[in-house]
Structures are given as C-alpha cells and as structure tokens.
C-alpha cells in the first residue's frame, strides 16, 4: 500500500502495454519500482545511472530467465514522481541511439508540461 510520502510512477511510454515479460521478471521490476517510490537509492546490479540521457536518469536491469532476455527500464527521479521513460529488450552492449533520443524527448515533454503548470 502506498503512503502519502511515496512517489507515484508516471508512465511516459507510447503504449499502455508492457513487453512480454516473464512472471518473475515482472515481480522483480515491481519490487524495484516500489523501493524507488519509497525513496530508496538503487545500485548495481539492479540499477545504474544513464548520464548520456540526463543527470536524473537511470536504468533498471532485469534479467528474464523465463524468456531468456534482459530488459532495461529507463526511469527518471523527479521531486514528485518516478518517471518511467522507456522499457526495452537489451540486445547490444550499448543503449541504441533511438532509445536515448526517445527518452530525452519524453523527459523534455514532461519538463515542458511541468513548467506550464507552475
């Protein structure tokens, strides 16, 4: 159950469906998001910073044994929310340029919307 101090998750993906993630990987992602919502800092091997996208951006690293894939979930830590900016299958050693651009765009759009409501 969320307390008043917990940060909400703001899903900034283009679709509301998640990738075909196995049950254990889905549970792990949910657990890690819950820790983030409570204000806990995550470190390797669960999470790492992604300064190429922005100073507040990190990625969750989820190994999905059921599907034999590794997932990456890009997220930003904002003052009032955890921003989920992308969820993709890790296929290469480096993050694809398309993913980096998409995450940057979503964060810009979010920040612009925040400025308009201030």
What are these model-predicted stretches?
Residues 1-69, 78-82, 88-118:
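Basic, Lys/Arg-enriched alpha-helical interface segments
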């Amino acid at each position: 159950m969320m307390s008043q101090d917990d940060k909400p998750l703001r899903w900034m993906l283009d679709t509301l469906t998640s990738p075909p993630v196995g049950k254990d990987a889905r549970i792990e992602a949910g657990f890690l998001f819950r820790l983030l919502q409570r204000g806990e800092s995550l470190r390797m091997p669960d999470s790492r910073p992604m300064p190429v996208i922005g100073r507040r951006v990190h990625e969750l690293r989820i190994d999905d044994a059921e599907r034999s894939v590794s997932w990456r979930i890009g997220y930003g830590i904002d003052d009032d929310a955890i921003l989920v900016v992308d969820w993709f299958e890790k296929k290469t050693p480096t993050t694809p340029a398309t993913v980096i651009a998409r995450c940057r765009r979503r964060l810009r759009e979010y920040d612009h919307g925040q400025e308009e409501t201030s």
